[in-house]
């Protein structure tokens, strides 16, 4: 991959969505997963054997399409350089564009974000994408336990996603005014009820977090809540001893439940600098700090302004939301050298294609056609590489990312210098 994790993951997810939507006319779509470190000559030999065996397919059309797909994959393997540290995934097959006779060969070569572990060869009516789902899952998980005498919340933070797993209430009475033996007896009952509540929290925490710990995906536990209850819970033996070792810190909070988790993440931000959620939040807050300055500071936003400044090499960090939905289209004349690049909303591509049929070349009057379509984020990533600009693709699941999407049409930037 290119080295920009947010861009790479966005493009990988986009490819996965596209692949899952492809369907062959018959059992003729080929999926090949090449493990990291596997010799390509071994894979090629296996495919040549499959090519030979495909001559036994009864349907001549299916046989021809399967053989064409295998040959395309063999050609792509020749272009790869060993060793492949991550392995490679190749999909190829004839995809119908409409009725009979509209099939066109499509091939996809993906470099996975994590090493491919197992060799797979699959011939089916759909591309085999199940293993790709595992690659897009965030592997690091933080466990969260919010607790006070009345209620508790157990949850996880995984990448940008906050998940509440369990909410508990104690039924423990509050303080009271009384005296004598009755008061002492009630106090013992309250303490016992509080103890039993802590035991329940510990049991649910063990049930929730131990499987994640055993998979080696639990990065740590964060404990929070109002008052001293959280400290008692952390210090005593309510948690499984292996989970106690994973406690990162405890935090004083005003709230429990999901809002309390967000409050905890804010307070724990110094500890969670590497968490995607905090990196995005800090970057977008930096943009807004520039924006609210009287002269606009080092901020830029909107498609026209950002594209202009990026071409000048003036952007330090480009922020793009994953829902931007723009395609960079290269249009050419079939009669002369005229070329034009335009940004088109992805959901309006069919309309753009229809309009292009009636549009004449401004230079010679010839017919125009689409030469290339590219996702705008992929296009921007290539420009950023040229100008040594950082590009961050942010989720709209967060409040900050949603603001960038709504207010600035999904595109904002922090400049290197004032323009």
Swiss-Prot record:
Keyword Phosphoprotein: no
GO MF annotation, one: translation release factor activity, codon specific
GO CC, any one term: cytoplasm
Pfam families listed in its UniProt record: eRF1_1 (PF03463), eRF1_2 (PF03464), eRF1_3 (PF03465)
Subunit structure, interactors included: Heterodimer of two subunits, one of which binds GTP.
PANTHER family named among the record's database cross-references: PEPTIDE CHAIN RELEASE FACTOR SUBUNIT 1 (PTHR10113)
Function comment: Directs the termination of nascent peptide synthesis (translation) in response to the termination codons UAA, UAG and UGA.
Protein's name in the database: Peptide chain release factor subunit 1
Annotated source species: Methanococcus maripaludis (strain C7 / ATCC BAA-1331)
Gene: prf1
